[in-house]
Amino acid sequence: SGSGKSTLLHVLSGLDRPTSGKVLIDGVDMFSFSDEKMAIFRRRSMGFVFQQFNLLDEYSVLNNICMPLRLDGRKPDETFLAEVTKMLGIEEKLKKYPYELSGGEQQRVAIARSILAKPHIIFADEPTGNLDKKAGEDTLNLLSSCAARFGQTLIIVTHDLEIAKKADRIIKIEDGKIVSNQL
């Protein structure tokens, strides 16, 4: 806690500007974009899964999942939507509202929302932090399975070493500094 993990994730995803250096994605410094182009780039290239789920209670599960696409003026690919919601086990929950779901179900909705726009990168900030052990393991397995199946890069911020051990690459941060970088 307080080591800079979430700050790093926010900088990598363009939510916060770095105080120095560049953030290159596909060789392009994303902070060279105008604010409007940055917003479009994030909507089309990045998905986000937060510890607090960040679902809108006044919208149905379906509308929460489709929100990033709608903000971009796009409609969901109905076949892909059906595939994602089935894979996540929420296909029967689409007409419900977030407050009617368990924490694990809400996190699956957040995962579906992050995947539906077919982003290249999914950023997950402590995605298991508010879940019990079983729901947390299920969430990690679903995130990993979805990223593998849909060819996405998954970047997870966690303080849980058991979660970190499942990663292809582990970057350890202490007091805002990278202290190890392992493949």
Protein language model features and the residues they cover:
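H-loop (His-switch) and adjacent beta-strand-loop-beta switch element
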Residues: 170-182
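ABC family nucleotide-binding domain
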Residues: 1-166, 170-172
